[in-house]
Amino acid sequence: MAQAAAAASQVNQIAPDPAVAFDRKVGEQYLRYAGMLARRGYVASSTGNLVMRVPHAKYPEGVCYVKCMGVSLEEMTLDDLIITDVPTGRILYGDRGTTVGHQMNREILRLRPDVNAVIHLHHDETIAFFAAGYEELKITGLTFPYLMQSYPHYLPAHINVEEDVVPIKTFIARTNCIIMKRHGFTVLGRNASECYGRTNVLVGEVKRNILAEQLAAARGTSPEYLSKEEIETMFRHGDAVMYPKAKS
């Protein structure tokens, strides 16, 4: 308990480390993905975020490039990026704080060493779909299971893992996507490209669910969704399909 309290007290503490230099190439990659998310219409406010973890010799868990509070992914510049550590949220580069959601991002990165990018967005159609009473997302197409490679984990509206990260450890090993009812979603990836692609297939699946339900209702039929067996087979073969290896 005391250790957790001590770590929490260091969140957003400005602790510049000369060993942590701002890598402009990483910053420009961050801006590229932030811009692509914004151009797709996913960015609703300053509270959505993208986090990219990069390795660092001094920090075994790497360091996080993340947007500071008060600006959106749509309007940000390189000057709005800060660098934090993973365990405590201390600001190693920059002088502005992070949003509360960065505590969730850091906990995900701490528990999932295979994950190096996290995208959190308050996506309109996702919020609306679950506000309409749907309990889970059905799968209509092949791309979602091949790329996401796990079922979404659903959090009820009364659980906010941005403010209280404790529940994350109970489910994060089994999913690459958290759907937060009345809130939005959080997507994990091994790199920024995969995380961005998974975000796109999630958004696409939400929209297809809405369209399939509307069109089927108009025709008096039921939508056709993939079966559990089909989905889980695609999960298992996801890497082979999405990232086939070159042969000599």
Predicted regions span which residues?
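Glycine-rich flexible loops
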Residues: 2-248
